[in-house]
Structure formats: C-alpha cells, structure tokens
C-alpha cells in the first residue's frame, strides 16, 4: 500500500493510459489503469472474444547472467532450473532461508541468461532476496525502465503475429526474442 506522502511510480505507458481516458488507481506502488471509458464489461467481452493488451510493467523484471546463474537460481526454489531448455519457461516458488514460500515467479531460459519476472507487490523484497542470496554467483541485472505487456484473448497470437510472425511457433510455457 502507498502512503499519501509517497508519490506513485509510473509505468513507461502511463501517459498513453491517461491519453486514452483510463481511470488510474494505486496498485503495488504504481499508478495503474483500472478501466477505460467503455467500461469493465465491454473490456472483458472484448478480451474474451478477441485480444486485449495489459500493462503489467509494475512487475519486477531481471536478468540473471553468468555461467553459474541457473545453478545459483535453483538454490532458491524447488524446481529444475539447470535442466530448463533454451526458449523454455517455468513457474517457480521463491523460497526463504527456511524453505518457506516467499512468492511465486516466472522465468525463461533465453540461452544467454535467465529472464525472471517477479510480482509487483513483493518486487522489492523478492529482488533483494535474490541479490543477497545469489548475487555473488551471477550478475543480477534489474530492468526498471522496461515495459512489460500481457496480450490475452483467443486472438492474441494472430494479433502479435502481424508484428512478429515468429511468435506463431511458440507454445505454452515457451518464450523467445523476435524482431519486428
């Protein structure tokens, strides 16, 4: 929660949201759009029938770089990180020092590094934990200025394929970089 004295952070798409008439609300320390002029029901129906773009830039994005990155990251969660193939994505649970669950996260093996996405509400604590526990074994690169978008709906692949045709080859829990 954000105190009145704390200024809300803005995603890279903040100005676009405001220009499109979004109603902005505090969420995870950011000013985030909660709805647009057409209303929630229209937005929901559009997403279910076509595809909608969601700004999830409040979530934490980081890269784990180095030859020991996968082995180091695997010490923080009860999932196989070392064996994750290039272009494959995995859901994981970030554990505290006692083995309790701190948070959940997603990561993908890009071939050069691990790209990690942590939840916005716990971003600072998650990133600090990762840096403190494995920062000496691999480089932890934060990406605070990057936007993160979620494209959802039955027409999502077709919509994105118009910009980056290679995305059609992706299946569930895979990822990749595409030129457009």
Give, region by region, the residue ranges found by the protein language model.
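Basic, glycine/lysine-rich polyanion-binding surfaces/domains
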Residues: 1-180
């Amino acid at each position: 929660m954000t105190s009145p004295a704390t200024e809300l952070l803005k995603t890279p798409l903040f100005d676009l949201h405001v220009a499109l008439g979004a109603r902005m609300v505090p969420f995870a320390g950011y000013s985030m759009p909660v709805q647009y002029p057409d209303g929630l029901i229209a937005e929901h129906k559009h997403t279910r029938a076509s595809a909608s773009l969601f700004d999830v830039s409040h979530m934490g994005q980081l890269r784990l770089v180095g030859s020991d990155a996968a082995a180091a990251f695997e010490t923080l969660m009860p999932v196989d990180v070392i064996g994750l193939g290039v272009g494959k994505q995995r859901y994981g649970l970030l554990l505290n020092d006692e083995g309790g669950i701190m948070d959940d996260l997603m990561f993908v093996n890009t071939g050069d590094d691990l790209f990690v996405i942590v939840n916005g509400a716990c971003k600072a604590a998650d990133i600090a934990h990762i840096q403190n526990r494995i920062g000496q074994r691999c480089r932890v690169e934060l990406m605070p200025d990057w936007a993160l978008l979620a494209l959802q709906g039955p027409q999502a692949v077709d919509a994105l394929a118009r910009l980056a045709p290679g995305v059609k080859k992706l299946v569930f829990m895979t990822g990749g970089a595409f030129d457009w």
